[in-house]
Design a protein with these regions (language model features):
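Active-site loop/oxyanion-hole signature of alpha/beta-hydrolase fold enzymes
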Residues: 47-51, 61-103
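Catalytic histidine-centered segment of alpha/beta-hydrolase-like enzymes
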Residues: 263-272
Length: 293
C-alpha cells in the first residue's frame, strides 16, 4: 500500500478554488482513475482504494465544491449535478488527462453516468458504488434528513458516535476505532478545535428545490450502454434496489455487478470483494495510458 500523495488545487469557471488529492502511479501504463464522492462526503473516503490502485495508475480523489478542502459556493443553487460534472471535466482538462475510469459513490456515481453520456470517448469505464438510474425514495428521504442538518458535537468521541448513529444501519460490524476513523474522514476541526461536518450545510437545499431533485435517469442509462460499467450494491441498501440492478442487467447484458454483504448505502470500497471486482474491471478496461492527446 502506497500512501504517497500530493495536494492539487484548480479554479472552477466561476472562480472557486477546488481541491483534489492525487496519488501518483508507481508504474506507468494504466489509465488514471477519478474517484468522486457521495453527497456529504469527500476525497478522504478513497484513501484506502487509492493506495490500493496507484501501484499501476494515477488516482485522483476529488473534493466537490462545498466539501473538504474545496471552497464553499456563495450561491447554493450551484450545488447540483451539472455544476459538479463541469468541475470534474475541468479537473481532468487541467491535468491533461484525455481518458479515465470513473469510480463514483452515490452522487459521484451519477456524475460518472452523466460524464459517460457527454463524452463517451473519454470515459473508459464507470464503477457505480450503490447508485444507478433509479433512486429509491426511502433512501433519498433518509439522506435528506441528515444532509447539512446534524446537531453540533463537542469532541471526536461524540463525532464518532454521531457517525455511527447516522450511518450505522448501513455499516454493521464496524468497531469503535473504525467509527472514529470514519468520523475523521467526514468531519474537520474548526478554529476552536471542535469537530464539525466537513461540508457546507447549504448543500441540503438541493433536496428542497424541484429543479435539482433527482430525475428518471433510465434514458441516460440507455445512452451509455456502450460504456463498460461495474455496479457495486450494498445488500442492505435503501437507495439502490436489487430490482433496479436486475433491470440494469436486462438493459445492458454485459453489465458487471456484485452485491456486498452487511453493507447498505454505501459500501466503503475497502471490502475484499470490492477491491477484487474493481481490480478485475480495471484489468479489462483500464490498461492504456491516456495523458495528453
Amino acid at each position: 500500500m502506497n500512501l504517497d500523495a500530493s495536494d492539487y488545487f484548480y479554479d472552477s469557471t466561476d472562480g472557486l478554488r477546488l481541491y483534489c488529492r492525487i496519488y501518483p502511479a508507481l508504474r506507468t501504463g494504466g489509465l488514471p482513475v477519478l474517484c468522486l464522492p457521495g453527497l456529504t462526503r469527500n476525497s478522504r473516503d478513497f484513501v484506502a482504494l487509492a493506495a490500493h490502485l496507484n501501484a499501476e495508475r494515477e488516482v485522483l480523489t476529488a473534493d466537490l465544491r462545498g466539501r473538504g478542502r474545496s471552497a464553499w459556493d456563495p450561491d447554493p443553487s450551484h450545488y447540483q449535478l451539472p455544476t459538479y460534472v463541469e468541475d470534474a471535466w475541468l479537473l481532468l482538462d487541467s491535468r491533461a488527462i484525455r481518458r479515465v475510469v470513473v469510480v463514483g459513490t452515490s452522487l459521484g456515481a451519477l456524475m460518472g453516468m452523466v460524464m459517460a453520456a457527454m463524452q463517451p470517448d473519454r470515459i473508459a469505464g464507470v464503477v457505480l458504488n450503490d447508485a444507478g438510474p433509479e433512486i429509491n425514495p426511502t433512501g433519498l428521504r433518509r439522506i435528506a434528513g441528515y444532509a447539512g442538518k446534524l446537531p453540533p458535537v463537542s469532541s471526536w468521541a461524540e463525532a464518532a458516535a454521531q457517525a455511527k448513529s447516522t450511518y450505522g444501519i448501513a455499516l454493521p460490524g464496524l468497531t469503535d476505532e473504525d467509527w472514529l476513523d470514519y468520523a475523521h474522514r467526514g468531519y474537520r476541526e474548526n478554529a476552536g478545535g471542535i469537530p464539525v461536518p466537513d461540508v457546507d450545510p447549504k448543500i441540503s437545499q438541493a433536496f428542497t428545490n424541484p429543479s435539482t431533485a433527482p430525475r428518471d435517469l433510465w434514458p441516460l442509462y440507455a445512452q451509455i450502454k456502450g460504456v463498460p460499467m461495474l455496479v457495486i450494491r450494498g445488500a442492505l441498501s435503501d437507495l439502490l434496489s436489487a430490482a433496479t440492478v436486475a433491470r440494469m442487467v436486462r438493459e445492458k447484458s454485459d453489465l458487471e455487478h456484485i452485491t456486498v454483504a452487511n453493507r447498505g448505502h454505501t459500501p466503503l470500497l475497502n471490502e475484499p470483494e470490492c477491491l477484487a471486482a474493481i481490480d478485475a474491471f480495471l484489468a479489462r478496461y483500464g490498461e492504456t495510458a491516456a495523458h495528453g492527446d
